[in-house]
Amino acid sequence: MNLTPREKDKLLIAMAAMVARRRLERGVKLNHPEAIALVSDFVVEGARDGRTVAELMEAGAYVITREQVMDGVAEMIRDIQVEATFPDGTKLVTVHEPIR
């Protein structure tokens, strides 16, 4: 299987998000990369489902809470930017203050 660098990045994010979900199910707090991956995956999948950029910018800020991440992680992540494929093309989605 020949994948483009973009496709490899998408797969890596999806896999990291799966790991993050499993850890949350076990009650383990997420680290920085896991938190980024979980929010990013939410945005990518939401775009595929037909949600709008505005909806994802708002909803992306409520995917995980401060209680679900390790100390200091929420302060480290001010914005998350994700290129997502929507029905009408690829767009950049920015989630401000993604961990509240």
Curated annotation (Swiss-Prot):
Gene3D superfamilies: Urease, gamma-like subunit (3.30.280.10)
Keywords: Cytoplasm, Hydrolase, Virulence
The keyword Lipid biosynthesis is annotated on this UniProt entry: no
NCBIfam families: PRK13241.1 (NF009712), urease_gam (TIGR00193)
Function according to Swiss-Prot or TrEMBL: Disrupting the ure1 operon causes loss of urease activity, decreased resistance to low pH killing in vitro and decreased pathogen survival when inoculated in BALB/c mice by gavage.
HAMAP family attached to this UniProt entry: Urease_gamma
UniProt subunit comment: Heterotrimer of UreA (gamma), UreB (beta) and UreC (alpha) subunits. Three heterotrimers associate to form the active enzyme.
Protein name in the entry: Urease subunit gamma 1
Organism of this sequence: Brucella suis biovar 1 (strain 1330)
Upper classification of the organism: Bacteria, Pseudomonadati, Pseudomonadota, Alphaproteobacteria, Hyphomicrobiales
